[in-house]
């Protein structure tokens, strides 16, 4: 099986990929992973450090052949505002919830989340269901480990470090149980904080 230990950015001159691999956004943050190519072959990606790949980036096989990374279609919401100012306000609300977002001149694209859709519609946004590649802004996405739906895959691709970040975002949607609320869950701590092992009868 061929190994991949290096890569090239999208648009590298004189690059001619001979194979492709389609990946959703939450599987494009990689370090070591077995990849199934579109032609049925498999390669082992084995990089020194985790890399957040974008559509069109190239993996370099040991034999010199190039593999193009393609962003797979995903179930998304397309968000449009009344005007540019309104769209900026909507982007602020999404950013305040640490959601991965693809921000364009006249629209914002996010993963489908019906709670968020209701919020956006309440703010006057037009929200449509679409299926297309998702390429969230790299800044916040890279530093925070992505949207709530990321932790299931990203953690396995680049070690336990993902857990230092991923679990602080998903829980903004009404089921938080992060460190800020640790004393609300007595069973997770010393029993002196709550029910004294159930022996208190008075």
From Swiss-Prot:
<dbReference type="InterPro" id="IPR007864">
    <property type="entry name" value="UreE_C_dom"/>
</dbReference>
<feature type="compositionally biased region" description="Basic and acidic residues">
    <location>
        <begin position="147"/>
        <end position="193"/>
    </location>
</feature>
<comment type="function">
    <text>Involved in urease metallocenter assembly. Binds nickel. Probably functions as a nickel donor during metallocenter assembly.</text>
</comment>
<dbReference type="InterPro" id="IPR012406">
    <property type="entry name" value="UreE"/>
</dbReference>
<keyword id="KW-0533">Nickel</keyword>
<dbReference type="GO" id="GO:0005737">
    <property type="term" value="C:cytoplasm"/>
</dbReference>
<keyword id="KW-0963">Cytoplasm</keyword>
<dbReference type="GO" id="GO:0051082">
    <property type="term" value="F:unfolded protein binding"/>
</dbReference>
<dbReference type="Pfam" id="PF05194">
    <property type="entry name" value="UreE_C"/>
</dbReference>
<dbReference type="InterPro" id="IPR036118">
    <property type="entry name" value="UreE_N_sf"/>
</dbReference>
<comment type="similarity">
    <text>Belongs to the UreE family.</text>
</comment>
<dbReference type="GO" id="GO:0006457">
    <property type="term" value="P:protein folding"/>
</dbReference>
<dbReference type="GO" id="GO:0016151">
    <property type="term" value="F:nickel cation binding"/>
</dbReference>
<protein>
    <recommendedName>
        <fullName>Urease accessory protein UreE</fullName>
    </recommendedName>
</protein>
<feature type="region of interest" description="Disordered">
    <location>
        <begin position="138"/>
        <end position="202"/>
    </location>
</feature>
<dbReference type="Pfam" id="PF02814">
    <property type="entry name" value="UreE_N"/>
</dbReference>
<dbReference type="GO" id="GO:0019627">
    <property type="term" value="P:urea metabolic process"/>
</dbReference>
<keyword id="KW-0143">Chaperone</keyword>
<dbReference type="InterPro" id="IPR004029">
    <property type="entry name" value="UreE_N"/>
</dbReference>
<dbReference type="GO" id="GO:0065003">
    <property type="term" value="P:protein-containing complex assembly"/>
</dbReference>
């Amino acid at each position: 099986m061929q190994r991949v230990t290096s890569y090239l950015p999208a648009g590298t001159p004189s690059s001619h990929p001979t194979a492709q691999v389609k990946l959703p956004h939450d599987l494009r943050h990689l370090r070591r992973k077995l990849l199934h190519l579109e032609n049925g072959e498999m390669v082992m990606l084995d990089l020194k450090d985790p890399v957040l790949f974008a559509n069109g980036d190239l993996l370099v096989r040991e034999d010199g052949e190039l593999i193009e990374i393609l962003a797979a279609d995903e179930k998304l919401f397309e968000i449009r505002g009344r005007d540019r100012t309104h769209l900026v306000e909507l982007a602020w609300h999404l950013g305040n919830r640490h959601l991965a977002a693809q921000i364009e001149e006249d629209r914002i694209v996010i993963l489908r989340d019906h709670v968020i859709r209701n919020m956006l519609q309440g703010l006057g946004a037009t929200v449509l269901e679409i299926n297309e590649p998702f390429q969230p802004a790299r800044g916040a996405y890279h530093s925070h480990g992505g949207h709530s739906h990321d932790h299931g895959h990203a953690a396995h691709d680049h070690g336990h470090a993902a857990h230092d970040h991923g679990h602080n975002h998903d829980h903004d949607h009404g089921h938080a149980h992060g460190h800020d609320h640790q004393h609300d869950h007595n069973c997770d701590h010393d029993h002196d904080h709550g029910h004294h092992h159930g022996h208190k009868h008075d």
